[in-house]
Each structure stands twice: as C-alpha cells, then as structure tokens.
Design a protein with these regions (language model features):
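Positively charged n-region of N-terminal signal peptides that target proteins for export
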Residues: 1-4
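Transmembrane beta-barrel domains of Gram-negative outer membranes and organellar outer membranes
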Residues: 21-139, 144-149, 154-172, 188-195, ...
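Conserved nucleotide-cofactor-binding alpha/beta core module
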Residues: 180-182
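Bacterial N-terminal signal peptides
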Residues: 6-16
Length: 269
C-alpha cells in the first residue's frame, strides 16, 4: 500500500486536460504561488530567475513537544536546535546554484537546479532536474561525501493548490547505499493569504526499520520574505538525512518537533 502512494500522486500530475491558464499565451507560464525554491525541507522545481539571490535560514528544535515538552521548557523551545543557513543564486533564467549548511554533523549541501519546463496552458507540469552532493565535515562520519540526483515535478491545480513529486537518489544515507525514495509535497490556501504546506517522505523499503517522515508548515509571504512555522517528526533538512528514513539525529514516527524557516530574496538588475 505504501508503494502505491507515490504512484497515485504521480498519476495525478498528468490529467487529461491542464489546469485553467492564468496567462494569455498557450506556453506562457502560469502564475506561481509563493512556494519558493524549497517547500519545507525539500526542493521545489522552481528557480529564482537570473541575477537573484535567496537567503534561507532554518531552525529545528531538538526536543519533541510530545516527549517531555511542557511549559517549563516552553514546549521544547528551550532545547537545543539544529540551525541551517543557505544561499542560492540565479546564475541564469532557468539555472540556480545553491549551498546550504546544516549544523547537524556539519552537513554541507551543494547543488545545481535546472528548470526544464514550466507549467502553462499546454504544458501540464513544471519539471526540473537537480544534482549535487552532501558533504559532512564532522569527524568520524562514515561515507561523508554523498552525491545525489533528483527529478522535481509540480502541478498547480488551483490558486494555492500545488502537488509536488520528487523521485530522488542519494549514494549514501546514514545506513543505506544507493537509496531511492519519492518525497511528496502539497500546498493549499487558507484565509489571510497564507498557505498550508505538507511534506511526506515514505519509509524506505530497503531498510526494515526506516520511518515515514512528515512535516507541516504555515507559510506566509510578505514582500520579498517567506516566513514558515514548522511542525514535524524529523530534524533532517538535507537530502542524505531524509531519503532513507534513517536520519542520524534519530526520530520516531509520532514525534512532534517545532521549527521555522525564513527566506529572503534579493534582485540584482
């Protein structure tokens, strides 16, 4: 049953007729919703555009709210946190180059993303390819250099409603070699010009005790900023820690951890 979920959602990306166009020409891209280049933890297929800079800050608290989190430790907010900072540069209209550093195991993620197609009246999908490497600088980490590749697919179904499917491979996770998985994403609008975003990564069937990872975020776009309040069970924010359901930080299916993302875009024209 678990294996059917990505297949069903992938099929949903390919309807008989495309969504209602929001642009005049049949190949003019539909207007994007403010998802950014990263949904919650995983990459979207969207690029920044030429000569644009994006700065990303992530914060994931270590203490689960439902395991010892209470008013005395502000429901886990007094605990330590994994912090990440990233930069992405629009090197060309359809090409982004990015670097992201997570404090957990000093994990650097270097990547390039190329936007192949963008959804339009006669193009039902947005398609991008992304490739790069995670490099962990913490001494003692096994297989610290971990190449990866992704096919990033998205379809805008209605205003604020987006479905994302991202078949992905990474050479090494904490416990797997040549791990493949299909992260899924969904967004839908709520009052106040905000979005609810959902990410789900199925447990990896190549590892018996792999766990499903899930995250939910309340996302608000204000000017050149995107602010997200995040809840989820895993602290992983890099692909090598996500795809295997075996993050070295450890997590349980029913954990609920809080966090936030702050994104700021700059234009240099």
């Amino acid at each position: 049953m678990r294996a059917l979920v990505p297949a069903v959602l992938l099929a949903a990306l390919l309807p008989v007729s495309p969504a209602a166009a929001q642009s005049a020409g049949p190949y003019d891209p539909v207007r994007r919703d403010p998802l950014g280049t990263v949904l919650i933890n995983g990459a979207t297929p969207y690029t920044l555009g030429s000569r644009r800079l994006e700065v990303l800050f992530t914060h994931r608290f270590q203490q689960p709210v439902n395991q010892g989190g209470d008013s005395h430790n502000l429901w886990g907010l007094d605990s330590g946190a994994d912090v990440g900072i990233g930069l992405a540069w629009g090197a060309a209209p359809h090409l982004d180059l990015s670097v992201y550093r997570a404090s957990f195991q000093e994990d650097f993620e270097l990547a390039g993303k190329f936007l192949v197609l963008e959804q339009a009246q006669r193009l039902p999908l947005t398609v991008a390819v992304r490739a790069g490497v995670d490099h962990l600088r913490r001494p003692g980490v096994e297989d610290p250099t971990r190449p990866f590749a992704q096919l990033l697919l998205a379809r805008k179904l209605a205003l604020g409603v987006n479905l994302l499917v991202s078949p992905s491979w990474v050479r090494d996770t904490p416990r797997l070699r040549n791990a493949f998985n299909v992260p899924l994403g969904l967004s839908f609008p709520i009052p106040g010009n905000s979005l609810i975003e959902i990410e789900y990564i199925p447990a990896n069937r190549d590892l018996g005790d792999s766990l499903d990872a899930w995250h939910v975020a309340l996302s608000k776009s204000v000017g050149g900023h995107i602010f997200e309040i995040v809840a989820g069970n895993s602290r992983a924010t890099t692909l090598d820690q996500m795809l295997g359901g075996d993050s070295a930080a450890g997590f349980r299916k029913r954990d609920v951890r809080l966090g936030f993302n702050i994104v700021r875009d700059f234009s240099f024209f």
